[in-house]
Amino acid sequence: MSRPLPYHIYFFTGLLTCWILCTSSAHKCTVRHEVADCSHLKLTQIPEDLPTNITVLNLTHNQLRRLPPANFTRYSRLTILDGGFNSISKLEPELCQNLPWLEILNLQHNEISQLSDKTFVFCMNLTELHLMSNSIQKIQNDPFKNLKNLIKLDLSHNGLSSTKLGTQLQLENLQELLLSNNKISSLTPEELDFLGNSSLERLELSSNQIKEFSPGCFHAIGKLSGLSLNNAKLSPSLTEKLCLELSNTSIENLSLSSNQLDTISHTTFSGLKQTNLTTLDLSRSSLRVMDNDSFAWLPHLEYLSLEYNNIEHLSSRSFYGLSNLRHLNLRWSFTRQSISLTSLPKIDDFSFQWLKCLEYLNMEDNNFPSIKRNTFTGLVRLKFLSLSNSFSSLRTLTNETFLSLAGSPLLLLNLTKNKISKIQSGAFSWLGHLEVLDLGLNEIGQELTGQEWRGLDNIVEIYLSYNKYLELTTNSFTSVPSLQRLMLRRVALKNVACSPSPFRPLPNLVILDLSNNNIANVNDELLKGLEKLEILDLQHNNLARLWKHANPGGPVQFLKGLSHLRILNLGSNGFDEIPVEAFKDLRELKSIDLGMNNLNILPQSVFDNQVSLKSLSLQKNLITSVQKTVFGPAFRNLSYLDMRFNPFDCTCESIAWFVNWINSTHTNISELSNHYLCNTPPQYHGFPVMLFDVSPCKDSAPFELLFMINTNILLIFIFIVLLIHFEGWRISFYWNVSVHRVLGFKEIDRAEQFEYAAYIIHAYKDRDWVWKHFSPMEEEDHTLRFCLEERDFEAGVLKLEAIVNSIRRSRKIIFVITQNLLKDPLCKRFKVHRAVQQAIEQNLDSIILIFLEEIPDYKLNHALCLRRGMFKSHCILNWPVQKERVNAFHHKLKVALGSRNSAH
């Protein structure tokens, strides 16, 4: 008999199965639109279960050591194969044979050390080959000779000591050759002659310690348009030699950034005279001195970058010869910290006079003392001038500050971060073409009279945000009616409520920013006349009082008339009320920001006109209820909603509609699952609003009629049940009476028709009492004759028949009611029923009840279906306990017997 396996074997078998399942599920490639992404999956082999029609395969960041050609047979349509960041050490020629349409092959960051002549023999359609960051130290023979369509070859970050990549002419279509970060120390014609038929647009040799440029090295290349030698530690003399070697070449772009070019002499770029160089990058080269006429050899130059240097002096001939320069970057070019103004970098007058074609000048982040009368003289085509953080003592802008720009068609002027404190009248009067003026982030503190902007006839935007303080007047902007964008954020704005409004002269205004000014008082004419306004920023002010119904004169409708407004920001104003007509005129509004206020209950029709709203922000308010009557119109076409951090009341009345909406809409709702939480009731506190169960909250409107009908039916049913329970006997009794009336029963009350005054119904056990008390009455009054069963029933007649006949011949029927009668079966089943029937046929008071005992009404009804309420009071008698009251009882009985059988 076999022994059972130990428990730990089962345990480890289960763990192994679980690990295999988890591993297989984790190693799943993502396939979308013929692109397979298998990156970061720790793959050791090529997946074999991908669609055969994929054109892009990403295998980066795995553990591949080979790219077996057989594994790519099923993926023959691949055009891009990325195998970067693996451990591939060898490429097999058959790879491209199985991938005939391959155009881009990326094998960067692998362990490839050698390339044979056969490696790429079948890669004839390859256009890009990336082999950067491998271990290739030398290229032997001609591994790239068959790559006739190759456009880009990247061999950077290898250990190459030479630029020689082949022994014969090849790579005739190559445009980019990247050899940066290698160990190349010299450039010779023999090492570059394989490019004799190539037209290189970019030769990247940066971060190589090149110490020699052999004669004719660049002429060995068929055509060279761009050369990068950044971070090559080129000295001034080596740079001059480089330029000589570039003479008479097709060079257009030359980048020499991050070198050791501390001085540029008159001869440094002389070798470039016979070129068409258009772009020169000399940034981060520790440049201090530029001799006169240094750039005289570059008449075709259009772009010059000198940023991040330490130039001491710019003379009137520093830029001589740059007659075609269009873009000049001098950012951080003159930076040198100094306490003394005399030792600050110096710019002579007329330094830019030679730059007749200059359109863009960037002089940001420098340390100039000020602007002289002729600093920018000669810039007759300048359109963009940035002087941000450029001056150490430019405190006041006078009418002479920009005199040197009088002849320039300047469109943009950036003066931010210069500690400017005052703008004098006519300071910009020379800049009649200016469209954008940026004065932000300064220390301006003054009253704006309007003369500051005199002469800005074409101004479109004025940026004054983040200054010390600005006091407005009625005429503050009368000189700039063309203004379309006005930024006044965080300027401690004063006198905003002046009348007429300071913004009334701006009929073309499209954007107005008045945020972060603690504005507390405005009038309803503040924005009057701004019919073209599209964007209004009023956040971070104190406008809450203006919209209160308790405000003297009522809410201030300062938004009226803005029929073209599209974006409105009213966040952080302390609003706790919104007038019902606050947004009435804003029919084209696309975005409203009311976040970080104190709003709780909004008027029902406040958003009725905002049917085009796309974005609504109400975050961090006190909103508890989101109902359709308020938010329905606003949510109709909404694309973005932000109502985070509101204390939602999670009840059917408050958010049922909202929950249904957010669970069915395609609107982008920020952080819905985390920051839309219930606050009340307590059992839902902290519960996500989107998970609130609305099934008990079905809209009652469609079922209201049904509810009312059901309720009425239920109430009627309960009423009938109670009526039957308490008065059913009465209804039954009168129903029977009515039926017999309808059937034509007539009242019979003729004395001669009856033989007996009354028929006495009693229990058999009570016969002695009946005989004892009724016989003496007959003896006393001979007109009274009672029908007693023991005495008056005919012999030989059936008892039941005798009872019927006797009842019919009796004028009245007397019930002697005792406990015995209630238990007597004959009385219960026949006598009482027949007597009641007779009473109904004759009339309603032909029955007399004599109670010998106290019998509750419910017992009487239960046993005999009789109730005291069915009879007149004189027909209900109680046998007296006291003997002296017996005569009175007899008198009452005679009265009852003598009463006429009238209708009850």
Curated annotation (Swiss-Prot):
Domain of life from the UniProt record: Eukaryota
UniProt keyword Phosphoprotein, yes or no: yes
Gene Ontology terms, MF aspect: RNA binding; signaling receptor activity
Membrane topology qualifier: Single-pass type I membrane protein
Any one Gene Ontology BP term: inflammatory response
GO cellular component: early endosome; endoplasmic reticulum membrane; endosome membrane; plasma membrane
Modification type Phosphotyrosine: residues: 759, 858
The keyword Transmembrane helix belongs to this UniProt entry's keyword annotation: yes
Record domain TIR: where: 754-897
Main location: endoplasmic reticulum
The entry's keywords: Disulfide bond, Endoplasmic reticulum, Endosome, Glycoprotein, Immunity, Inflammatory response, Innate immunity, Isopeptide bond, Leucine-rich repeat, Membrane, Phosphoprotein, Receptor, Repeat, RNA-binding, Signal, Transmembrane, Transmembrane helix, Ubl conjugation
Residue location of crosslink Glycyl lysine isopeptide (Lys-Gly) (interchain with G-Cter in ubiquitin): 812, 831
Subunit-structure text: Monomer and homodimer; dimerization is triggered by ligand-binding and is required for TLR3 signaling. Interacts (via transmembrane domain) with UNC93B1. Interacts with TICAM1 (via the TIR domain) in response to poly(I:C) and this interaction is enhanced the presence of WDFY1. Interacts with SRC; upon binding of double-stranded RNA. The tyrosine-phosphorylated form (via TIR domain) interacts with WDFY1 (via WD repeat 2) in response to poly(I:C).
Annotated family: Belongs to the Toll-like receptor family.
Protein name: Toll-like receptor 3
Gene source species: Boselaphus tragocamelus (Nilgai)
Upper lineage: Eukaryota, Metazoa, Chordata, Craniata, Vertebrata
Encoding gene per record: TLR3
